[in-house]
Swiss-Prot record:
<feature type="transmembrane region" description="Helical">
    <location>
        <begin position="233"/>
        <end position="253"/>
    </location>
</feature>
<feature type="transmembrane region" description="Helical">
    <location>
        <begin position="639"/>
        <end position="659"/>
    </location>
</feature>
<feature type="topological domain" description="Cytoplasmic">
    <location>
        <begin position="585"/>
        <end position="599"/>
    </location>
</feature>
<feature type="topological domain" description="Extracellular">
    <location>
        <begin position="278"/>
        <end position="315"/>
    </location>
</feature>
<dbReference type="InterPro" id="IPR007603">
    <property type="entry name" value="Choline_transptr-like"/>
</dbReference>
<dbReference type="GO" id="GO:0034228">
    <property type="term" value="F:ethanolamine transmembrane transporter activity"/>
</dbReference>
<feature type="modified residue" description="Phosphothreonine">
    <location>
        <position position="14"/>
    </location>
</feature>
<keyword id="KW-0812">Transmembrane</keyword>
<protein>
    <recommendedName>
        <fullName>Choline transporter-like protein 2</fullName>
    </recommendedName>
</protein>
<feature type="topological domain" description="Cytoplasmic">
    <location>
        <begin position="462"/>
        <end position="504"/>
    </location>
</feature>
<feature type="transmembrane region" description="Helical">
    <location>
        <begin position="257"/>
        <end position="277"/>
    </location>
</feature>
<feature type="transmembrane region" description="Helical">
    <location>
        <begin position="34"/>
        <end position="54"/>
    </location>
</feature>
<comment type="function">
    <text>Choline/H+ antiporter, mainly in mitochodria. Also acts as a low-affinity ethanolamine/H+ antiporter, regulating the supply of extracellular ethanolamine (Etn) for the CDP-Etn pathway, redistribute intracellular Etn and balance the CDP-Cho and CDP-Etn arms of the Kennedy pathway.</text>
</comment>
<dbReference type="GO" id="GO:0034229">
    <property type="term" value="P:ethanolamine transport"/>
</dbReference>
<keyword id="KW-0496">Mitochondrion</keyword>
<dbReference type="Pfam" id="PF04515">
    <property type="entry name" value="Choline_transpo"/>
</dbReference>
<dbReference type="GO" id="GO:0022857">
    <property type="term" value="F:transmembrane transporter activity"/>
</dbReference>
Length: 706
């Protein structure tokens, strides 16, 4: 038996030996992984340089404002187009050209105007009359009436026809409506194209569809933004409620851990049960209603999610999903009921540790602020990089011409050879790009920007884990609690992490960042290859995505435990990761049962908080609470604030529970070390609490017993 035990330990490393000088986290330690610290500092300097370059060349106005054929912004304050907020297309029918899908521009002149045309008028009719004063505001800036009509229309100085239009996303689109099933614009069922020909309204519809297709995503974003502007304070109230519930839950957990865990389990089951009941009631209510039996497949994707709530199949799907979750949770609770008692003991011990280090509950705010700083820098740099291209002008024409698609200069295009080669062609703004070294490097800079975001974000999370681990390890290794607990354990752990272990944190976060950026690239390639019919390529891509997902999960698990060892012993990252991994492998059964059951209980706590706040938000924003029915704001998509509240509530609950989770993981690792280092004798007493000793049938022997 002893030989087997020796072989087992040899296979998974050597257990920690008794050290009479060890009293918890080592204070006299040296710097670790200095090379990685230097690399991180150099990378940050380079990241700042990239940000400065991007801010120098970038122009976010290119995202906000529409751009005319000369590359000038419509509605931008401080410019000559400050009062011209709308983009007007000379001939929107040409937007039906396939060129729109290739160049993302309609092959027709576009100008900025103060307001969209509100009457039907042709250039031939307006020319030489008083109505031309109204008409010429839709001609190119600086137009002078010294050309023949044919020259004006050929050169694209004025549109051939004005059609009643309405603004949509700062663009002028024909005001098309249906009257008794017939499409009309104004009071007409057809229109004159300005060249003496009558055309059908459907031509306008096709042109408007193609032009509008480019803007649908932006229009959806604008409607979502409108919902945020009228509901942001209610969203904040919902997040505050989630914060209060999380804090209240953790305070109660400190004093009533056992009762709270069982109450939490029962409440989650009841919440899911109510969800099943509500889905069944909605399913029954829709029986017999017109259109409620349409299948989800036949309906297809709809941006207005309220449409799905009028289908019986939707509520049936919800009911099945919730029922499956209910059965899974009940079965897990039945088979893990004995292990739950052990997990409760760990949570109680963690509650005591958090009680002695109460400032640890505020540390997630520090992590949150640092992450917000990383996100803000990454997002602003990405926007400035994406808008740092120069305006590129190309030749557009609705005729077949060799020069179409070539770059041009709008200043001298009328005197160029391409203009004479392609009569009726226009040199207009196409997109933002460039051929300089900087512009060719933009994709690489965007990848570097994303990589640095992952690295710094993971570094911030690692700093928080090491800080909390150091504080809670100080609690565990205090033989007489709380008398032997050092003053300000959280601040001491934070200082040690930054002073000695910045390099180790940079090393661990670098490994994770590399895997994450590879996963992002794989997702990008997967989107690009979706149209391909190569089954082997799809299979290979799926395998790669799965492998790197598993690798990321493993590295996160290994890093977390390595950071605990760094906080305790002050060793470098590789040594800490190896020791933590072998320690866990020597106690793999305890890891699988105790640690993961505790994680499961914390997940149930998050679901309870998120579910409660989510249900409250659903009833509020759908005007189903009669007391505050008139208080809820009118919305385009009520799911926007509901999803925001749900995601925000989860992040808040996760922030609070992450402290508890780190505490449990730290105490668990310290507990395993305690079992290997000590034997309960006077010389080598156990540091674990009396509760854990009773739970594991361990005791510290008294002098007479020794």
């Amino acid at each position: 038996m002893g030989g087997e035990r020796q072989h087992y330990y040899g296979k998974h490393g050597t257990p920690q030996k008794y050290d009479p000088t060890f009293k918890g986290p080592i204070y006299h330690r040296g710097c670790t992984d200095v090379i990685c610290c230097v690399f991180l500092l150099l990378a940050i300097v380079g990241y700042v340089a990239v940000g400065i370059i991007a801010w120098t060349h970038g122009d976010p106005r290119k995202v906000i404002y529409p751009t005319d054929s000369r590359g000038e912004f419509c509605g931008q304050k401080g410019t000559k187009n400050a009062n011209k907020s709308y983009l007007f297309y000379f001939n929107i029918v040409k937007c039906a050209s396939p060129l729109v899908l290739l160049e993302f521009q309609c092959p027709t002149p576009q100008i900025c105007v103060e307001k969209c045309p509100n009457r039907y008028l042709t250039y031939l009719k307006a020319h030489g009359t008083q109505e031309f004063e109204y008409y010429k505001q839709f001609c190119v800036p600086g137009f002078k009436q010294n050309k023949a009509v044919t020259e004006v229309l050929r050169d694209g100085d004025c549109p051939a026809v004005l059609i009643p239009s309405k603004p949509l996303v700062q663009r002028c689109f024909p005001a098309i409506h249906a009257h008794k099933g017939v499409l009309m614009v104004g009071n007409e069922t057809s229109y004159e194209d300005g060249h003496g020909f009558r055309k059908n309204i459907t031509d306008l519809v096709e042109g408007a569809k193609k032009a509008n297709g480019i803007l649908e995503a932006r229009h959806l974003a604008m409607r979502i933004f409108e919902d945020y502007t009228v509901s942001w304070y209610w969203i904040i109230i919902g997040l505050v409620i989630a914060m209060v519930l999380s804090l209240l839950f953790i305070i109660l957990l400190r004093f009533l851990a056992g009762i709270m865990v069982w109450v939490m389990i029962v409440m989650v089951i009841l919440v899911l049960g109510y969800g099943i009941f509500h889905c069944y009631m909605e399913y029954s209510r829709l029986r017999g209603e017109a259109g409620s039996d349409i299948s989800l497949v036949d309906l297809g994707f709809q941006t207005d999610l309220r449409v799905y709530l009028h289908l019986r199949q939707t509520w049936m799907a919800f009911m099945i999903i919730l029922s499956i979750l209910e059965v899974i949770i009940i079965l897990l609770l039945i088979f893990l009921r004995k292990r739950i008692l052990i997990a409760i003991a760990l949570i109680k011990e963690a509650s005591r540790a958090v009680g002695y280090v109460m400032c640890s509950m505020l540390y997630p705010l520090v992590t949150f602020l640092l992450l917000c700083l990383c996100i803000a820098y990454w997002a602003s740099t990405a926007i400035f990089l994406s808008t740092s291209n120069e305006a590129v002008y190309k030749i557009f024409s609705d005729t077949d011409c060799q020069a179409v698609g070539k770059t041009c200069n709008p200043e001298n295009f009328s005197s160029s050879s391409e203009f004479h080669l392609c009569p009726g062609a226009h040199c207009q703004f196409a997109f933002y790009g460039g051929e300089s070294t900087y512009h060719r490097a933009l994709l690489g800079l965007q990848i570097f920007n994303a990589f640095m975001f992952f690295w710094l974000a993971n570094f911030v999370l690692a700093l928080g884990q090491v800080t909390l681990a150091g504080a809670f390890a100080s609690y565990y290794w205090a033989l007489k609690k709380p008398d032997d607990l050092p003053a300000f354990p959280l601040f001491s752990a934070f200082g040690r992490a930054l002073r000695y272990h910045t390099g180790s944190l940079a090393f661990g976060s670098l490994l994770l960042a590399i895997v994450q950026i590879i996963r992002v690239m794989l997702e990008y390639l997967d989107q690009r290859l979706k149209a391909a019919e190569n089954k082997f390529a799809k299979f290979l891509m799926t395998c790669l995505k799965c492998c790197f997902w598993c690798l990321e999960k493993f590295i996160k698990f290994l890093n977390r435990n390595a950071y605990i060892m760094i906080a305790i012993y002050g060793t470098n990252f590789c040594t800490s990761a190896r020791n933590a991994f072998f320690l866990l492998m020597r106690n793999i059964i305890r890891v699988a049962v105790l640690d993961k059951v505790t994680d499961f209980l914390f997940l149930l706590g998050k679901l309870l908080i998120v579910g409660s706040v989510g249900i409250l938000a659903f009833f509020f924003f759908t005007h189903r609470i009669r007391i505050v029915q008139d208080t809820a704001p009118p919305l385009n998509y009520y799911w926007v604030p509901i999803l925001t509240v749900i995601v925000g509530s989860y992040l808040i609950a996760h922030g609070f529970f992450s402290v508890y989770g780190m505490c449990v993981d730290t105490l668990f690792l310290c507990f395993l070390e305690d079992l290997e280092r000590n034997d309960g004798s006077m010389e080598r007493p156990y540091f674990m609490s009396p509760t854990l000793k009773r739970l594991l049938n361990k005791t510290n022997r008294k002098p007479a017993e020794s």
